Amino acid sequence: FNKIKKNIPEPFAIDNKRLAISKKELFYLEPINLIMIFYISHFTNIEIHPKTLRYITDCTKLIKKSLINNKQVNSIFYDLLTSSDDPSKTLRLMNEANVLGRFIPEFQKVVGLIQYDMYHYYTVDEHTIFTIANVHLVKNGFFKNVSSFATEAILKIKSFKPLMVAMFLHDIAKGQHGDHSANGAQIAKKICPRLRLNSDDTELISWLVLNHLLLSKTAFRYDLTDKKIIDKCADVIQSKERL
């Protein structure tokens, strides 16, 4: 990525220390750049020029089925979403520019969606992005004084990238009829292959989405001194990695 930083690829350029594009028509020629610009911005830590952001917002209608199913674009988005450096700032910017919901149409349904429950202080889209940010805060030891166990545990996770995809998808079925966890698990099975994930990772992500409320429901609704409750929970989880 240092090479990217030194040699910003065309049609991008640096304008007043910010990533820019000279004409919005250039997005019409290569719509892939509507995703690529966020990728470059994230991995070079160069902010996108406000004028270019307006161009992007004006051009989101170019994000059509052909771009959504483009292998290269999906690889770019996957690398951004699962970056070892917290991508939440970039994802939030993509969301504000209406790029995120256009590229992941299933996500568009939760943009601005309000939930009246104990888990959501924010709209579902913002809650999702905060969740991703918090995972990185845990990983980087921000909460170590509060819970050193969480920091130690997350550093042992082998499937960190699938975890980040699951974080992005965990509430994607909110606002739909039925159980949002079960519906979300089915949506995950459709989105994951699009992001070039293999069958094992797809199954893991779908399982995480399906069971993302298991621990909180068990902790808040059942007697944790009852061995049967703990055994039942353990039977669902099956492994330390999934836990």
Residue ranges of predicted features:
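Intrinsically disordered or highly flexible coil/loop and linker segments, enriched in small
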Residues: 43-51, 62-65, 83-90, 99-104, ...
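Non-catalytic interface/linker regions that flank or bridge core catalytic/transmembrane domains
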Residues: 1-120, 189
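Phosphate-handling DNA/RNA-contact segment within nucleic-acid enzymes
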Residues: 134
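Divalent metal-dependent catalytic cores for phosphoryl transfer on phosphate-bearing substrates
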Residues: 114, 123-124, 150-243
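Conserved alpha/beta core surface patches that mediate binding of polyanionic ligands
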Residues: 2-5, 143-153
